């Protein structure tokens, strides 16, 4: 059976994070960083907090509560933007809208080279995404 779109998205992000790691942040730093992003994006700031989760779950975006639960007390910037993307997107899956928004956020709040590399990982995995030039 072929991997699902979600599995391919996660695999692409994992491969990207191995090649171009993003910073790990304390919970206080994560909350401050996402507050800055939320202000720039014109949305309320989500609360980031540590929570017990299964070993195969790194984090969860809880849309109704507008918060992000993380398993580890030092999440990466990519993990935080992944979950922030879930909060910002209308579709709560890992489809084209999600990947396009994630690359846009990485571009604006981490770096252009990181965004280009993540975009390439998605394309190399045959995942659809809006053209990179329109993500910036």
List where the protein language model places each region:
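Short, small/polar residue-rich loop motifs at catalytic or cofactor-binding pockets
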Residues: 74
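Active-site recognition of the HExxH zinc-binding catalytic motif
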Residues: 78-90
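Metalloprotease/metallohydrolase-associated module, dominated by Zn2+-dependent proteases
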Residues: 2-71, 91-136
């Amino acid at each position: 059976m072929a991997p699902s779109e979600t599995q391919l998205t996660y695999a692409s992000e994992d491969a990207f994070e191995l090649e171009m790691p993003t910073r790990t942040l304390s919970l206080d730093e994560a909350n401050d960083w996402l507050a800055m992003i939320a202000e720039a994006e014109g949305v309320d700031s989500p609360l980031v907090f540590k929570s017990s989760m299964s070993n195969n779950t790194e984090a969860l975006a809880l849309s109704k509560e507008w918060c992000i639960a993380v398993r580890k007390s030092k999440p990466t910037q990519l993990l935080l933007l992944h979950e922030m993307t879930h909060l910002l997107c209308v579709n709560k899956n890992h489809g084209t809208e999600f990947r396009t928004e994630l690359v846009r956020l990485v571009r604006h709040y981490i770096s252009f080279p990181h965004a280009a590399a993540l975009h390439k990982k998605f394309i190399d995995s045959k995942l659809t995404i809006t053209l990179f030039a329109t993500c910036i």
